[in-house]
Design a protein with these regions (language model features):
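PAPS-dependent sulfotransferases, especially Golgi type II membrane carbohydrate sulfotransferases
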Residues: 1-59, 226, 233-371
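Pre-Walker A (Motif I) flank of P-loop NTPase domains
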Residues: 62-65
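Hydrophobic anchor at the beta1->P-loop junction of P-loop NTPases
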Residues: 68
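P-loop (Walker A) phosphate-binding loop of NTP-binding proteins
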Residues: 71
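A conserved segment at the C-terminal end of the G1
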Residues: 77-90
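PAPS-dependent sulfation machinery
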Residues: 95-188
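Short catalytic-loop micro-motif centered on adjacent basic/acidic residues
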Residues: 187-191, 313-315
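Conserved phosphate-donor/acceptor-positioning beta-strand/loop module used by diverse small-molecule
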Residues: 191-193, 202-227, 330
């Protein structure tokens, strides 16, 4: 069998997999929805957990937390997965989905229950295998609860260094400490695509934060994004659970409920929406959106020296093609121990490859639009 035949077979197999009806485990769905509806009581439980752990938390230090961000499908998840295997790193996991606010008490309870222990391909059907111990992006639960504009694409979502919210900051830092304590780790790691407009704010309130901004070739990136959006739209039609759960945990990048990130460019967002009305997969719309986000990031890095010095821009293609070199740069930038990451580095140097289960299907006109 030739490599082309093999690739075609993989593509066909992946296409057939897309016909299945994805479902989160029912206990996770119902618990997540229940706790979302009683959020006031959940916040009281959070305060109780904090009080319970207060003597221990005084000994926990937030040291150079690592923030992975960039547009969805850029390679942020595989970067999260890789770094989460560092023995010093603590992060949110699938096990935290129902009760993200209680990283210690909920984890202590959930680990005793035999739910979601089997490994399976995640909802995105992109070859990433997960179970309850796998890293997951859950921070948006807090941001969207506290700040009303973060999921409102008609308003600027930029949080710069001028914003003050002492109450949220106390909660946020305490939560990080509780998560690190619960996992016996020293370095906090998080992935949140929506944090791309908050890097200036995060840098101001956590001065030693480290940022990894993942960038991908726009042709492949948009092909992956459009494919994913089609998939989510298809799955959401007959799966209310998927739609509800992704809204609760703040995963709104794809499908009928996707929310654009507004970088103080409402007219541009409106234009994108007009294009999507005619065609939800309009290449021009996605290209404009991609450019607006990374142009904003470029401007921040050029005008904010403090943020720039704390940021490493990682090209996804370089990460796949020159894995060892780029992994070393990531570890150097984050300040994680290279020695304690050697085995993981070897594994991911072999594992990191550009996706083969699909290929961009753009015509010449589409490619020119993207360029």
């Amino acid at each position: 069998m030739t490599s082309d035949d093999s690739s075609q077979k993989q593509t066909q197999e992946h296409s057939h997999k897309q016909d299945f009806q994805y479902s989160y485990p029912l206990p996770i769905y119902y618990l997540t929805r229940f706790f979302d509806k009683i959020n006031g009581l959940v916040k009281l439980a959070d305060k109780f957990e904090t009080l319970l752990l207060r003597p221990k938390l005084s000994e926990v230090r937030i040291d150079r937390p690592i923030y992975i961000t960039g547009l969805a499908r850029a390679g942020t998840t595989i970067t999260l997965e890789m770094l989460s295997n560092h023995p010093d790193v603590g992060n949110h996991k699938y096990i935290h989905i129902p009760m993200t606010y209680l990283p210690f008490l909920w984890q202590s309870f959930a680990l005793k229950v035999n739910v979601f222990t089997e490994r399976a391909e995640r909802i995105h059907q992109d070859g990433i295998i997960v179970n309850r111990d796998s890293p997951e992006a859950l921070e948006e639960v807090f941001w969207q609860r506290r700040f009303s504009n973060v999921m409102d694409e008609s308003k600027s979502n930029i949080m710069d260094g001028l914003i003050d919210d002492d109450e949220f900051l106390r909660f946020y830092k305490t939560h990080i400490k509780k998560l690190l304590f619960a996992q016996h780790k020293t370095r906090y790691l998080t992935k949140n695509n929506y944090n791309v407009t908050r890097i200036e704010y995060i840098k101001r309130v956590i001065p030693d934060a480290r940022f990894l901004i993942i960038v991908r070739n726009p042709i492949n990136h948009l092909a992956s994004t459009i494919k994913q959006s089609k998939l989510f739209k298809k799955m959401s039609k007959n799966n209310e659970r998927l739609e509800v759960l992704t809204q609760i945990i703040g995963h709104r990048e794809f499908g009928p409920n996707r929310v654009c990130i507004n970088v103080d460019n409402t007219p541009t967002i409106n234009y994108i929406r007009e294009l999507w009305k005619n065609d939800p997969n309009d290449v021009e719309a996605w290209a404009i959106y991609w450019n607006s986000i990374y142009e904003y990031v470029k401007n921040v890095l050029e005008t904010n020296e403090k943020v720039a010095s704390s940021t490493l821009v990682v090209n996804y293609e370089d990460l796949c093609d020159n894995s060892e070199e780029i992994i070393d740069k990531i570890i150097d930038h984050t300040g994680l121990s290279k020695r304690r990451f050697r085995k993981v580095k070897k594994i991911y140097a072999k594992k990191l490859r550009k996706p083969k289960y699909y290929k961009p299907e753009f015509g010449d006109e589409d490619i020119q639009t993207i360029k």
